[in-house]
Design a protein with these regions (language model features):
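Helical substrate-recognition/capping region of FAD-dependent monooxygenase/halogenase enzymes
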Residues: 1-219
Length: 219
């Protein structure tokens, strides 16, 4: 993030010099520089090309969605699932590649709640942990309620699927979630994914309790 910010500042900082604008110039000198910039001369053409190139590079300054949303990291508050992060298929700074891999930010998908359109991001956060599951995931919901009471931490549940409390009306969540209907995502209050199970565990209570204990450093 810091490296990208410094690079962006460098790109933006080139514009005045390309235009010929420098500290201490008089108004007349500044306008003369602009006149030369638009002139039918080799220098004018060279500077206009330099500005066009600089504008193209500014996509990294104004449209770096990958930098803004694609944070991926490991920590003691993230429990890996033994798989690597998905490889980026496009420029990781410019393009956001959604994933539910532990350590990633929960992907945005439009779903419905009580007939109103909301984002998956609205279903989580709000200062609490959230368990996301799907059709057949009732055991995860029960486990979250029991563990939350045990540890004194609120763990909300957000069942997402066709005709569930959070209705996946268009099936977009099913395409984005990277787990099965009976799988589970444990989402932290900051909307980063702390842990996931690709399918229903043999003992969902123990599996979720182990994840919660690890994330909260209770082990």
């Amino acid at each position: 993030m810091v490296d990208r910010a410094l690079k962006s500042a460098d790109i933006v900082g080139r514009v005045p010099s390309i235009l010929g604008i420098r500290p201490g110039q008089t108004d007349e000198e500044g306008w003369a520089a602009i006149d030369e910039f638009v002139a039918d001369t080799d220098d004018g053409r060279k500077r206009r090309k330099a500005l066009e190139d600089c504008i193209d590079e500014n996509a990294y300054h104004f449209h770096a969605h990958g930098v803004e949303l694609g944070h991926r990291y490991t920590s003691t508050a993230v429990v890996g699932d033994g798989t690597p992060f998905p490889a980026h298929t496009r420029d990781p700074e410019l393009y956001y590649q959604p994933t539910t891999h532990p350590g990633a930010y929960l992907p945005h998908v439009w779903i419905e709640r009580n007939g109103e359109q909301i984002s998956t991001l609205d279903a989580v956060g709000h200062g609490r942990f959230t368990v996301i599951t799907g059709i057949g995931g009732e055991a995860w919901v029960a486990a979250a309620e029991k563990i939350g009471a045990e540890v004194g931490v609120e763990i909300a549940s957000a069942p997402i699927g066709y005709r569930l409390a959070f209705d996946d009306v268009y099936g977009d969540w099913a395409r984005a979630r990277e787990i099965s209907d009976g799988g589970c995502l444990l989402v932290r209050p900051d909307r980063h994914i702390a842990w996931r199970s690709h399918g229903m565990a043999d003992d969902p209570l123990s599996a979720l309790r182990e994840a919660i204990d690890a994330v909260l450093s209770r082990v």
